[in-house]
């Protein structure tokens, strides 16, 4: 059970960190264009 939780956390971080990074870049570009 603990291994599954750790794997879930690792997968969530692996997905969320690049997504957040791309989202921040997108917001910065959008605000610069407007």
From Swiss-Prot:
GO cellular component terms, semicolon-separated: chloroplast thylakoid membrane; photosystem II
Recorded topology in the membrane: Single-pass membrane protein
Domain of life: Eukaryota
Pfam families registered for this protein in UniProt: PsbM
Subcellular location(s) of the protein: Plastid, Chloroplast thylakoid membrane
Any Gene Ontology biological process: photosynthesis, light reaction
TM ranges: 5-25
Cell membrane recorded as keyword: no
UniProt entry keywords in alphabetical sequence: Chloroplast, Membrane, Photosynthesis, Photosystem II, Plastid, Reaction center, Thylakoid, Transmembrane, Transmembrane helix
UniProt main location, coarse: plastid
Function: One of the components of the core complex of photosystem II (PSII). PSII is a light-driven water:plastoquinone oxidoreductase that uses light energy to abstract electrons from H(2)O, generating O(2) and a proton gradient subsequently used for ATP formation. It consists of a core antenna complex that captures photons, and an electron transfer chain that converts photonic excitation into a charge separation. This subunit is found at the monomer-monomer interface.
Family: Belongs to the PsbM family.
NCBIfam families: PS_II_psbM
Assembly mode: PSII is composed of 1 copy each of membrane proteins PsbA, PsbB, PsbC, PsbD, PsbE, PsbF, PsbH, PsbI, PsbJ, PsbK, PsbL, PsbM, PsbT, PsbX, PsbY, PsbZ, Psb30/Ycf12, at least 3 peripheral proteins of the oxygen-evolving complex and a large number of cofactors. It forms dimeric complexes.
Stated name of the protein: Photosystem II reaction center protein M
Organism annotation: Marchantia polymorpha (Common liverwort)
């Amino acid at each position: 059970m603990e291994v599954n939780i750790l794997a879930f956390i690792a997968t969530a971080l692996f997905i969320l960190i690049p997504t957040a990074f791309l989202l921040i870049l997108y917001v910065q570009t959008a605000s610069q264009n407007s």
